[in-house]
A protein has these predicted regions:
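Rossmann-like NAD(P)H-binding beta-loop-alpha module
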Residues: 165, 176-210, 214, 218
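N-terminal Rossmann-like FAD-binding beta1-loop-alpha1 element of flavoenzymes
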Residues: 3-30, 191-199
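Conserved N-terminal Rossmann-fold NAD(P)-binding element of oxidoreductases
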Residues: 8-9, 31, 147, 185-186
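Glycine-rich flavin
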Residues: 2, 19-26, 31-178, 211-215, ...
């Protein structure tokens, strides 16, 4: 009997599980509201690495003179809008590649928000209610429901993101001009990446952290 599997969330955990399940003959459906690939592909891991690769060009140019190559780089030459446009374009391309791979494996993709549906209050069932973008709802039955909703940026009560002066790591790629001074709250991997990248671009950067060192979850020597 074919197993019916519904996966809530289309990030790395969700789409990898979907691919494996489909390859083993399961009937798989992914319900996702933010885009296949999730935060990792669309807003975090892939975009940040692309962004860092851009700043790495300046790093190479600074070292060029040591190798006998005359090179001059004007920090104002950065076209941040163009840089971020490339970042977003590559992220969308990878998301599209993952979507195509899922569809080739026969995975059904639904765009909407999902929640576990209980036809009788207090009685857990293997049903999921999907609310589509147009407001319509549909209840799907499953043998297995996998919740893989991932993470979202933490918002501080007294510093709500407004997309202009206070930004989450999702909104940072909407900037079109380099800031004169960037304050990064958090010393984890994402925070450290942005500190490194914007410093290399000539921006004054201040890191604020509640921990006693950068990269608190990594090896102490590396941090």
């Amino acid at each position: 009997m074919t197993q019916r599997i519904i996966i809530i969330g289309g990030g790395p955990a969700g789409y990898e599980a979907a691919l494996v399940a489909a390859q083993h003959g399961a009937d798989v459906t992914i319900v996702d509201s933010d885009g296949i690939g999730g935060n990792c592909v669309l807003y975090d891991c892939v975009p940040s690495k692309t962004f860092i690769a851009t700043t790495g060009v300046r790093t190479d140019m600074r070292r060029a003179e040591e190798m006998g190559v005359q090179a001059h780089f004007d920090p104002t030459a950065y076209r941040l809008g163009q840089v971020n446009g490339r970042v977003k374009s590559l992220a969308r391309a990878q998301s599209a590649d993952i979507r195509a791979q899922l569809q080739r494996e026969g995975v059904r993709l639904l765009s909407g928000r999902a929640r576990v549906h209980n036809s009788q209050p207090g009685m857990a069932t293997h049903s999921v209610e999907v609310t589509f973008e147009n407001g319509q709802k549909k209840v799907l039955d499953a043998d297995v429901v996998l919740v893989a909703t991932g993470s979202s940026p933490r918002e501080l009560p007294d510093a709500r993101p407004d997309g202009e002066r206070i930004l989450t790591w999702r909104q940072l790629y909407d900037l079109t001009e380099l800031p004169k001074h960037l304050v990064v709250v958090g010393s984890g991997v994402t925070g450290a990446e942005f500190v490194s990248a914007f410093t290399e671009m000539g921006v004054k950067v201040t890191m604020v952290s509640s921990r006693d060192r950068v990269l608190p979850h990594e090896d102490a020597d590396a941090a």
